[in-house]
UniProtKB/Swiss-Prot annotation:
The chain crosses the membrane at residues 5-25, 52-72, 83-103, 109-129, 131-151. Belongs to the UPF0756 family. It comes from the Bacteria. It comes from Exiguobacterium sibiricum (strain DSM 17290 / CCUG 55495 / CIP 109462 / JCM 13490 / 255-15). InterPro entries: UPF0756_TM. This is UPF0756 membrane protein Exig_2210. Pfam families: DUF441. It is a multi-pass membrane protein. Keywords: Cell membrane, Membrane, Transmembrane, Transmembrane helix. It is found in: Cell membrane.
Length: 156
């Protein structure tokens, strides 16, 4: 019963915040649970959902290449100015950080729970976009790594 109430609450937060992604995701899970397919679908969705989501986002990003709107010339021209170079480097940095985040999320379920809570808050109240768990986990992994180094240095 708690899961139903939680999902209904998320739908309501999505409605209040006018966040279609949160509404659709929570309603989808609510429907799957209500019709009794949760036992069959949730394990696969939980195990592979992030990979599916990243794949879908990647496909959406690649559409301009597939349509011919972006070719090799545009790609090369995009990194000639300072904005392009900074964006290029930011893309590299974020991808590396997110890779570390995936590992952290798989290692510790509590990290995933805390990130989920933060992401729900950001999506619901600040009109955030729920790509945050991967980046959030990557940033958390980076900060945790730095924390460990500092603690080791202090404790000798």
């Amino acid at each position: 019963m708690e899961a139903y109430l939680f999902l209904i609450g998320l739908v309501l937060i999505g409605v209040i915040a006018q966040n279609k992604s949160l509404i659709i995701a929570a309603a989808f899970l609510l429907i799957i649970k209500a019709i009794g397919l949760d036992g069959r679908l949730f394990p696969s969705l939980q195990a592979k959902g992030i990979t599916w989501g990243v794949t879908l986002i990647t496909a959406a990003i690649l559409v301009p290449i597939a349509t011919g709107d972006i070719g090799f010339r545009e790609l090369l021209n995009s990194v000639r100015g300072h904005i392009g170079i900074i964006s290029f480097l930011a893309g590299i940095f974020v991808a590396i950080i997110a890779a570390h985040g995936v590992g952290l999320m798989k290692e510790d379920p509590l990290v995933t729970t805390a990130l989920l809570a933060g992401t729900i808050l950001a999506v619901g109240l600040f009109r955030g976009v729920p790509v945050g768990p991967l980046i959030g986990a990557g940033i958390a992994a980076l900060v945790i790594g730095m924390w460990d180094i500092i603690v080791k240095a202090i404790s000798g």
